[in-house]
Amino acid sequence: MARENKKELIGKVVSDKMSKTVVVEIVQRKMHPIYHKYLKVSRRVKAHDEREESKLGDKVKIVESRPISKEKRWRLIEILERSK
């Protein structure tokens, strides 16, 4: 039975030097609990790119998946915007 509610994130490709793998940086805004100021919190995840179609600077959508390797738990779904 497949789980339907998998996480989807949008981020920017910051590295494409590995084969079939891209590093995606996800930037989120979180509010500080005391000072009520919004902070930019970023994290970098490795995502599987089977066809090696994304390039450095592309805006991509990734989805959570089964573990593909030691650090890869995300797959590339689509490229939302190409880099210039």
From Swiss-Prot:
It comes from Borrelia duttonii (strain Ly). PROSITE patterns: RIBOSOMAL_S17 (PS00056). One of its GO terms (cellular component) is cytosolic small ribosomal subunit. Signal peptide: none annotated. Keywords: Ribonucleoprotein, Ribosomal protein, RNA-binding, rRNA-binding. This is Small ribosomal subunit protein uS17. Pfam families: Ribosomal_S17. GO terms for molecular function: rRNA binding; structural constituent of ribosome. GO terms for biological process: translation. Belongs to the universal ribosomal protein uS17 family. One of the primary rRNA binding proteins, it binds specifically to the 5'-end of 16S ribosomal RNA. Part of the 30S ribosomal subunit. PANTHER family: 40S RIBOSOMAL PROTEIN S11 FAMILY MEMBER, SMALL RIBOSOMAL SUBUNIT PROTEIN US17M. InterPro entries: NA-bd_OB-fold, Ribosomal_uS17, Ribosomal_uS17_bact/chlr, Ribosomal_uS17_CS.
